[in-house]
C-alpha cells in the first residue's frame, strides 16, 4: 500500500538520537497505529513494547534482530518483524524511509 486514506496524524514528531531518526504517528480508521519516519546514516538500538513490522520504503540498513548474532541487510521493498518487549540493532547505510506497524496483543 503506497498511501493511507482518512487517517489521523499526530503533529508532533518523535525525534531520537539527536534528530538522526524521526517519525510521525498516524492512526488508521480501524484504530491501527503506524509511524512514518526517516533515519540518517548511523548505528542505533531500539526497544519495543509491542510487536513491530518494519517496512523499508527507501534506502538500506543492516539489522540484528533479537536472538541473532548476525546483521542482515534490508532494502527498499523488504520488511522484517521485531518481537514485543525486545530490542534490535541497526546500522543505517544511507537515508532510510520506513513505515512501522504496531501489532497489538
From Swiss-Prot:
Q: Which keywords, in A-to-Z order, does the entry hold? A: Glycosyltransferase, Transferase
Write down the Pfam families for this protein, in alphabetical order.
Answer: Ppnp
Report the EC number(s), separated by commas if there are several: 2.4.2.1, 2.4.2.2
Name the reaction it catalyses.
a purine D-ribonucleoside + phosphate = a purine nucleobase + alpha-D-ribose 1-phosphate; adenosine + phosphate = alpha-D-ribose 1-phosphate + adenine; cytidine + phosphate = cytosine + alpha-D-ribose 1-phosphate; guanosine + phosphate = alpha-D-ribose 1-phosphate + guanine
- CDD domains according to UniProt: cupin_PpnP-like
- What is the enzyme's main class? transferase
General function of this protein: Catalyzes the phosphorolysis of diverse nucleosides, yielding D-ribose 1-phosphate and the respective free bases. Can use uridine, adenosine, guanosine, cytidine, thymidine, inosine and xanthosine as substrates. Also catalyzes the reverse reactions.
Q: Which PANTHER family match?
A: PYRIMIDINE/PURINE NUCLEOSIDE PHOSPHORYLASE, PYRIMIDINE_PURINE NUCLEOSIDE PHOSPHORYLASE
Protein name in the entry: Pyrimidine/purine nucleoside phosphorylase
Species of origin reads: Clostridioides difficile (strain 630)
- Its gene is ppnP
Amino acid at each position: 500500500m503506497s498511501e493511507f486514506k482518512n487517517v489521523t496524524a499526530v503533529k508532533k514528531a518523535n525525534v531520537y538520537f539527536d534528530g538522526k531518526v524521526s517519525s510521525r504517528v498516524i492512526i488508521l480508521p480501524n484504530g491501527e497505529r503506524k509511524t512514518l519516519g526517516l533515519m540518517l546514516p548511523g548505528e542505533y538500538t531500539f526497544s519495543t513494547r509491542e510487536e513491530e513490522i518494519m517496512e523499508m520504503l527507501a534506502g538500506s540498513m543492516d539489522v540484528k534482530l533479537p536472538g541473532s548474532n548476525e546483521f542482515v541487510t534490508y532494502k527498499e521493498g523488504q520488511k522484517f518483524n521485531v518481537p514485543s518487549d525486545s530490542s534490535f540493532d541497526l546500522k543505517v547505510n544511507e537515508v532510510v524511509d520506513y513505515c512501522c506497524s504496531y501489532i497489538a496483543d
